[in-house]
């Protein structure tokens, strides 16, 4: 990263923190990882409402929607690690297999690149390990 880009990035972070502080002082130090620990998976009723038949009765089921979400998050690279961890957990809860999740991530290598795919696979594997421990 160049110095100019690093400076711009820091300014953007600072601006975001100031905006969060202006909207809600409690959001200044919000950490998605804390939210992940608080709510590791969404209750089945809410999952079905958001991703399933309530809003889209004839469309995609929750599992398919979550696999698509995993694909979209994978392309973002390491920017959305907590979101990917939570979505992998949700997909498993919705009936997706580890193989389906891995294939979804593999497919995204063409769009997000190999580093993004590798990072997403590492994250998914860590979620699998956590699930196996439970």
Curated annotation (Swiss-Prot):
Keywords: Cell membrane, Membrane. It is found in: Cell membrane. Gene3D superfamilies: AhpD-like. One of its GO terms (molecular function) is peroxiredoxin activity. GO terms for cellular component: plasma membrane. Pfam families: CMD. SUPFAM superfamilies: AhpD-like (SSF69118). It is a peripheral membrane protein. Disulfide bonds: none annotated. May have a role in the regulation of NDH-1 biosynthesis. It comes from the Bacteria. This is Uncharacterized 15.0 kDa protein in nqo9-nqo10 intergenic region.
């Amino acid at each position: 990263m160049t110095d100019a880009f690093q400076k711009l990035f820091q300014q953007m972070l600072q601006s975001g923190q100031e905006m969060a502080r202006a909207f809600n002082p409690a959001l200044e130090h919000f950490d998605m990882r804390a939210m992940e620990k608080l709510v590791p998976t969404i209750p089945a009723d809410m999952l079905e409402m958001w991703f399933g038949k309530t809003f889209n009765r004839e469309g995609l089921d929750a599992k398919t929607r979550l696999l698509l979400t995993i694909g979209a998050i994978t392309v973002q690279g390491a920017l959305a690690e907590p979101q990917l961890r939570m979505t992998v957990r949700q997909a498993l809860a919705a009936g997706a297999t580890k193989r389906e999740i891995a294939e979804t991530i593999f497919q995204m290598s063409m769009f997000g690149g190999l580093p993004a795919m590798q990072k997403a696979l590492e994250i998914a594997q860590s979620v699998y390990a956590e699930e196996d421990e439970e």
